[in-house]
Amino acid sequence: MSSPITPLSPGCVMLPARPEPLPVDPKTTAVIVIDMQNAYASPGGYLDLAGFDISGAAKVTHEIKGVLEVARSAGMTVIYFQNGWDDGYVEAGGPGSPNWWKSNALKTMRARPELQGKLLARGQWDYELVDDLTPQPGDIRLHKTRYSGFFNSQLDSVLRARGIRHLVFTGIATNVCVESTLRDGFMLEYFGTVLEDATHQAGPDFVQKAALFNIETFFGWVSTTADFKGTFGQLAPG
């Protein structure tokens, strides 16, 4: 195990993580909830209809709920992302966009025309957050149109205005939107930690392991919900 990183401020506490523990100040930390929508976490949602295994989504929802309770009590900022597009799919891009070719939601709708207008469209059930993760007063909701939460969104300005330096990631899918957002945050000088049991992959189990390996080796840190709650659950309310 590597040596702990030197604390950045007096308010920091040490969060157990891989490859080394790191100091985290709740006042400059945001928990990012990536795409916990019916599309990704509910039977009959886009990911399920596209043939992906979503059996782990219910456990992830439960874990995230516990993390958010602790985060709010500790004074952390909570940010929810919802992925999708306008109901006419202009934001998704046409054939001139690689997103048109690679988005599995768009490909599923082209293969099944009866689903057109239902997947990842604002105003539709698929786009909405799952019932168990309803935002609370003070939480922030942001919209994104691509895998990374930093692309064409207000995330960076929201974080900088609040002095946020550390991002704790939860949500679906680890190997797509979670990793993409954490990577872009790294390039913008944000510290990123993913809670591995509060995320779920799109695809076989090995892609979860590969994404976590990439994160802890090159772009950030990996911790668990138990370590997060154990570290911050004893703090006085923020």
From Swiss-Prot:
CDD domains: cysteine_hydrolases. Its EC number is 3.5.1.110. The keyword Chloroplast does not apply. It comes from the Bacteria. The keyword Hydrolase applies. Keywords: Hydrolase. Coiled coil: none annotated. It catalyses: (Z)-3-ureidoacrylate + H2O + H(+) = (Z)-3-aminoacrylate + NH4(+) + CO2; (Z)-3-ureidoacrylate + H2O = (Z)-3-aminoacrylate + carbamate + H(+); (Z)-2-methylureidoacrylate + H2O + H(+) = (Z)-2-methylaminoacrylate + NH4(+) + CO2. One of its GO terms (molecular function) is hydrolase activity, acting on carbon-nitrogen (but not peptide) bonds, in linear amides. The active site is at D35, K144, C177. SUPFAM superfamilies: Isochorismatase-like hydrolases. GO terms for biological process: nitrogen utilization; uracil catabolic process. InterPro entries: Isochorismatase-like_dom, Isochorismatase-like_hydrls, Isochorismatase-like_sf, RutB. Hydrolyzes ureidoacrylate to form aminoacrylate and carbamate. The carbamate hydrolyzes spontaneously, thereby releasing one of the nitrogen atoms of the pyrimidine ring as ammonia and one of its carbon atoms as CO2. Belongs to the isochorismatase family. RutB subfamily. NCBIfam families: RutB. This is Ureidoacrylate amidohydrolase RutB. It comes from Caulobacter vibrioides (strain NA1000 / CB15N).
